[in-house]
From Swiss-Prot:
SUPFAM superfamilies reported in the protein's UniProt record: Winged helix' DNA-binding domain
InterPro entries: HTH-type_TrmB_regulator, TrmB-like, Tscrpt_reg_TrmB_C, Tscrpt_reg_TrmB_N, WH-like_DNA-bd_sf, WH_DNA-bd_sf
Effect of deleting the gene: Slight growth delay compared to wild-type. No fibrous chromosomal DNA isolated from cells, DNA condensation is normal. Chromatin DNA is more sensitive to micrococcal nuclease. Alters gene expression levels of about 10% of the genome.
Protein name as annotated: DNA-binding HTH-type transcriptional repressor TrmBL2
Family of this protein: Belongs to the transcriptional regulator TrmB family.
């Protein structure tokens, strides 16, 4: 029903509870109502009508007309809904600024922990990363910290979704060799990766397919374990290893792909 949809929208987007939304719809429909009248024309229980109408007035959706029996009329929907959106935008803006300031303060406070002499990953050189979000964060971290060399054999996700992070790492001085699957080339048209390849700022080749997508940044290696079910549910398991011997093994495999790949 149309009435149910109006109530649903008011609840979902304009911070009214169920009884408030029903009461406001009734006020808009009837114009002016007393608490008793509201109970008779809406699904708001009689014992709750006074509280509900006062709450609507406090939120700016209704105006009371004092008298022997208080009457309430609605604020025009166009006015109150627009006002709500404007106030919400301002509130979100303030919250965003507060979060940015909190982030900066936290980073400043955590600097001594980040820059400590203790190795960042302790004695651990192997981490298991699960889920697309965590894998993305780990990849971003690798691009931020790489100093010399990036070797990327990519079947789609990194080149498309983390292009800016990759380009920034190259701009900061890292040399990059990238192999992409040929099916990905069309999606890279007009991209920064393609632009940098044409300008000689990175080396780019394409291969029909490769069994082992990988990312190597200096001594760090990141690769996914094959699990189609996990990939379907965006919970693929990836392994991060920081060890020059493992790096050498993966780099040898990357070089095999590189020799077979065609220059773009």
């Amino acid at each position: 029903m149309v009435k149910d949809r109006m109530v649903e929208l008011l609840q979902e987007h304009f911070e009214l509870n169920l009884y408030e939304a029903r009461a406001y719809v009734a006020l808009v429909g009837f114009g002016v109502l007393t608490p008793a009248e509201l109970a008779s024309v809406s699904e708001v229980p009689a014992p709750r009508t006074y509280d509900v109408l006062r709450s609507l007035e406090k939120k700016g959706f209704a105006i009371s007309q004092p008298g022997k029996v208080n009457k309430y009329r609605p604020v025009h929907p166009e006015n109150i809904l627009e006002k709500f959106i404007e106030e919400w935008q301002e509130r979100v803006k303030e919250e965003l600024e507060a979060k940015k300031k909190a982030k900066e303060e936290l980073i400043e406070l955590m600097k001594p922990l980040i820059e400590t002499e203790i190795p960042k990953y302790g004695v651990e050189r192997v981490w298991v990363v699960r889920g697309i979000r965590n894998a993305t964060l780990k990849t971003k971290e690798m691009f931020e910290e790489v100093k010399e060399k990036i070797l990327l054999a990519d079947d789609g996700y990194i080149a498309i979704n983390l292009e800016n992070d990759l380009i920034k790492a190259i701009d900061n001085g890292a040399k990059a060799k990238i192999i992409v699957s040929k099916s990905l080339l069309k999606r890279l048209e007009g991209s920064k990766i393609m632009e940098y390849a044409k300008k000689g700022k990175l080396e780019l080749r394409a291969l029909d397919k490769f069994e082992l997508p990988m990312l190597i940044c200096d001594d760090e290696v990141f690769f996914a374990l094959e699990d189609m079910a996990a990939r379907y549910f965006n919970y693929e398991t990836q392994v991060w290893i920081k060890d020059f011997r493992v790096r050498d093994l993966f780099e040898a495999k990357f070089n095999e792909y590189w020799e077979k790949a065609e220059k773009v």
